[in-house]
């Protein structure tokens, strides 16, 4: 999966079911998981993270979920066709035997630890590797340490066969220049593949993730509508749209992601997250969103995908001003 220096392709990981479950108090049903995972898989997202938001094997004190880890794993596995499935484990909060369950259903496991305590999670790393799981080390609360401390942890992880190490902006503290410094430090210390997981407390999650990619990160995390702990995560619709504008991720169906975000996530949490996917689509295509409500109504009345109508309108419309009549002509043409 590592790309050449001449053309690096980002690898997008969606954690709507895992980190996004904070936004619904860990109450996703197994039907929710099937629908969300199925939509993401169909859209071409290559890595999908599931399981309890805090950690697989979470005790009741971490917040009871609507279903067990195994029920979530089975639900996701029943619908996924192409994506790799994984979960997060926090060794300080979970029993090592939980790794065995992950090995029965999943493809990868992300092990959370602060940068100065990597040796404490070595038993979990070895157990996961013995189960054939792709292991990623998540250096949580990265902002607490200087970049060279993360670099040393990343080098140690690579020495024991770990291929992926993440910078994790747990508290949403980073600015883009911080994301760059930390990613570059990890990249410079070993040939480990670097990931970036951003939170949106300063409304910088998308900008930080793009900067992390430019600095050399390969794995980029996001969630539908930016659902997640606290202020939320990097909104995957924005992230994919921005990367596609740069010529990346041609195999990902952006319209399908827009539709999944609205159908699967809107209204699900009492807290407001993210930007309306249709507004993102208007921005992506360079259309003035003044007529978004007319377009929505016309598309829905015709039984068409709003995202598809936006895309077709952008292809057909060449003028400076988009009128309701312009939209109506597009809809009629799509129905013909």
UniProtKB/Swiss-Prot annotation:
Residues 10-258 form the Pyruvate carboxyltransferase domain. It catalyses: oxaloacetate + H(+) = pyruvate + CO2. Pfam families: HMGL-like. GO terms for biological process: L-leucine biosynthetic process. Keywords: Lyase, Manganese, Metal-binding. Mn(2+) binds at residues 19, 197, 199. Its cofactor is a divalent metal cation. Activity is metal ion dependent and can be restored upon addition of excess Mn(2+). Homodimer. NCBIfam families: PRK08195.1 (NF006049). Exhibits oxaloacetate decarboxylase activity. Lacks any detectable aldolase activity with 4-hydroxy-2-oxopentanoate (HOPA), 4-hydroxy-2-oxohexanoate (HOHA) or other 4-hydroxy-2-oxoacids. This is Oxaloacetate decarboxylase. It comes from Mycobacterium tuberculosis (strain ATCC 25618 / H37Rv).
